[in-house]
């Protein structure tokens, strides 16, 4: 019944768009773009003598449709489209403070459960996710898609465990288009630096890439698909986003290096991808490390989808940020009116404490065992 109502509503909206020229409330000498539910809509029927005519927005809104005019384009979204329930479980993260029965590690992995698609987003560092998943009541064999946000060991370390031990019934691995070109990842320390998970601070280069390559995946007959465009849809509710351009404020960490031949160059993380879940409250954005900038990722997705952001979950890499950048991030989150911010992994103590102090009603620590549900 719900599907029938949704179809009828979409038909009404489409019919109204096709007959727009009968109600020329807004006319533009320059043809404009029309988007329905984030997708481009044909406007050939709306052109009269090279003038684009738009309908009375009020008639659309009576049908439960949101209409937004912006930058020479019209965005039409069916406000009454009901999405299915969503459950996001953090299988592993740096801390297990709230769930001491689960295994924590320096890494990140989340499981996204929707009606028509189950996604394992990143796999942590050590391959402990099957044990944690079992305790959380999650059957990893029901995984439809495995998504790797980028090619670092603390997000891809559990891949072999998934491939060789979990062996999901039928799944596809999704990675950024340059993932396998960017496997030779290193961290450079000038010496005397802080002790980190992967280094004691000694001078030199430390390998921080994956423990597998494409040949390994091919040997185990893993199906691979690449995120080689701005957006790839996994299901009606879940999408992957890539092609994040370098931001003006959030600079790349010069310590993150890529080995090409016998040379080291700045790692631009061109393979980095993020995931979104479309819910009844707005988009949930799931990130791995946000090496390309957490605001850059969130703002890019908002610009591409023209949908409200309900929540942001995952790593933000604000661990490297100074007070000014952290404050800039807080201001931007407030401006976008994001309701929930689940900080994880590489966010850093200073950023977590600062953000939690300023917007305590929105922020929580998304640690091992945290479960988010949206009906």
Place the predicted regions along the sequence by residue.
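Active-site neighborhood of phospho(di)ester-bond hydrolases with catalytic His/Asp-centered motifs
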Residues: 120-123, 143-151, 174-177, 285-289, ...
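Primary recognition of N-terminal secretory signal peptides and signal-anchoring hydrophobic helices
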Residues: 1-82
């Amino acid at each position: 019944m719900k599907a029938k109502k949704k179809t009828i509503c979409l038909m009404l909206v489409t019919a109204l768009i096709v007959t727009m020229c009968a109600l020329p409330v807004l006319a533009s000498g320059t043809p404009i773009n029309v988007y329905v539910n984030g997708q481009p809509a044909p406007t050939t029927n709306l052109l009269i003598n090279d003038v684009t005519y738009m309908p009375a927005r009020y008639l659309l809104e009576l049908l439960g449709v949101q209409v937004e005019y912006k930058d020479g384009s019209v965005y039409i979204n069916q406000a009454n489209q009901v999405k299915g329930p969503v459950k996001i479980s953090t299988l592993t993260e740096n801390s297990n403070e709230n769930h001491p029965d689960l295994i924590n590690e320096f890494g990140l992995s989340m499981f996204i459960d929707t009606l028509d698609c189950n996604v394992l987003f990143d796999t942590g560092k050590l391959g402990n996710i099957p044990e944690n998943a079992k305790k959380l009541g999650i059957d990893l064999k029901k995984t439809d898609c495995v998504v790797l946000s980028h090619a670092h060991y603390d997000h891809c370390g559990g891949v072999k465990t998934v491939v060789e031990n979990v062996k999901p019934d039928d799944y596809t691995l999704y990675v950024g288009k340059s993932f396998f070109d960017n496997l030779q990842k290193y961290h450079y320390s000038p010496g005397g630096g802080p002790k980190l998970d992967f280094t004691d601070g000694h001078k030199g280069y430390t390998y921080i890439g994956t423990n597998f390559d494409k040949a390994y995946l091919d040997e185990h007959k893993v199906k691979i698909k690449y995120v080689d465009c701005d957006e790839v849809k996994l299901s009606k509710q879940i999408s992957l986003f890539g092609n994040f351009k370098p931001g003006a404020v959030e600079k790349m960490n010069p310590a993150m290096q890529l080995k090409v031949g016998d040379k080291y160059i700045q790692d631009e993380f061109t393979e980095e991808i993020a995931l979104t879940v479309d819910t009844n409250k707005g988009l949930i954005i799931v990130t791995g490390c946000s090496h390309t900038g957490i605001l850059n990722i969130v703002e890019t997705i908002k610009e591409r989808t023209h949908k409200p952001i309900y929540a942001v979950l995952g790593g933000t890499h604000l661990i490297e940020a100074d007070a000014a950048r952290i404050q800039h991030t807080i201001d931007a989150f407030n401006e976008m009116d994001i309701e929930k911010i689940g900080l994880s992994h590489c966010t850093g103590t200073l950023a977590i404490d600062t953000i939690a102090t300023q917007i305590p009603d929105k922020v929580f620590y998304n640690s091992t065992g945290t479960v988010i549900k949206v009906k």
